[in-house]
Regions:
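Short hydrophobic/aromatic beta-strand or adjacent loop that forms the aromatic wall/cage
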Residues: 56, 160-165
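Acetyl-CoA-dependent GNAT
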Residues: 26-85, 89-90, 102
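Conserved GNAT acetyl-CoA-binding A-motif
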Residues: 109-121
């Protein structure tokens, strides 16, 4: 605290990519909806995004000045955080940007977070990605997608019904 005003330190990191370009990860503090096109890649219904966007911390990853990925993280309990949305533009997928963003989150929340959660559909694409990032199965919410979305959600040709939660113990 400085006087009676709380101080919040905002920072960005920069790292070199394999192409020798600078990768930057920065918080988004205002006008988060400017990234709606990217957010909708991970969560197809805007009304669902509205449930967590303003209460969550948002980050964008850019390389060479061009946005590649974004994520939104919410605090669910004192030491439990959840990745609510993580998306990479299709032309940049499978190039390590999502994993870099998750690794950044692990460092960013270290010391404040005991458990990091991520919820996803029962997808043959998403679950192996999160497992590769160190997450393990936690639990599932049956019929989450069919009960909460106004249209069927498909990924890799499969209709998503249950929300599958994975967790990572941050003490490991």
């Amino acid at each position: 605290m400085f006087g009676s005003m709380p101080i919040r330190i905002i920072f960005a990191i920069q790292i070199r990519s394999n192409s020798n370009e600078m990768i930057s990860i920065q918080p988004v503090l205002h006008n988060k909806k400017q990234y709606l096109d990217l957010l909708l890649l991970a969560d197809e219904q805007e009304s669902m995004i509205d449930r967590y966007l303003e209460r969550g911390e948002m980050f964008v990853l850019s390389e060479g000045g061009s946005i590649r990925a974004s994520c939104v993280v919410t605090r669910e309990a004192e030491d439990v955080f959840e990745i609510k949305n993580i998306a990479v533009y299709p032309q940049f997928q499978r190039q390590g940007y999502g994993k870099k963003l998750i690794q950044y989150l692990f460092g960013h929340y270290a010391g404040r977070c005991r458990t990091m959660l991520v919820g996803t559909g029962d997808s043959p694409l998403a679950i192996p990605f999160y497992e590769n990032c160190g997450f393990t199965y936690s639990h599932r919410i049956p019929d989450f997608f069919t009960d909460n979305y106004d249209h069927p959600i498909y990924e890799a040709g499969k209709q998503l019904k249950d929300m599958v939660y994975l967790k990572r113990n941050m003490d490991e």
